[in-house]
Swiss-Prot record:
The record marks R17, K24 as: Transition state stabilizer. This is 2-C-methyl-D-erythritol 4-phosphate cytidylyltransferase. The gene is ispD. GO terms for molecular function: 2-C-methyl-D-erythritol 4-phosphate cytidylyltransferase activity. Catalyzes the formation of 4-diphosphocytidyl-2-C-methyl-D-erythritol from CTP and 2-C-methyl-D-erythritol 4-phosphate (MEP). It comes from the Bacteria.
Amino acid sequence: MTSRLFALIPCAGTGSRSGSALPKQYRTLAGRALLHYTLAAFDACSEFAQTLVVISPDDAHFDARRFAGLRFAVRRCGGASRQASVMNGLIQLAEFGATDADWVLVHDAARPGITPALIRTLIGALKDDPVGGIVALPVADTLKRVPAGGDAIERTESRNGLWQAQTPQMFRIGMLRDAIRRAQLDGHDLTDEASAIEWAGHTPRVVQGSLRNFKVTYPEDFDLAEAILAQPARAS
């Protein structure tokens, strides 16, 4: 039996660093909600059985009319952290017929620069892998170590072998669910899915990502994202 593909978009964050009262995933960029670009990229990939958006139970900003015509489902099962939201979403995927052997691609709602081409590159690279992996970029900048709360450089860190994690992150549903559960039992709240997979003793792979697939986090990021989204994505 061929494994199916599901997408999971954790969308329960408040965007506290973005400088806006409106959660960043609902801010308008180039005429559309930021979340719209993420959903449109996955909607363009007919390979997916379902795309599930996880929002907070008390989300008062989500308006399905802003995403009319796109294929996705929504569940109000967001948790107190990304890890909790992803875990709850994985459980909800069973409602759509997902099994432990199926693949899930978890993607940040705040990465609107994702493209169908990059999604398909990740799938093509990992569909036969025993573990799965992520899109990422080799670190290009020089890294400085500074003590917490300070501003004095302690040392320069080698960037050799360092990659900056992006999303989507692609793993088997059962493996990822078990890995997150193990991390939770061990008292760890990890910031991405690959960290949970690593914590469980597995070795994810990296697939070359894209600079346009950056995470919108700070106020100045919105102008950059809008400029990128106004331009057609290059095929890759």
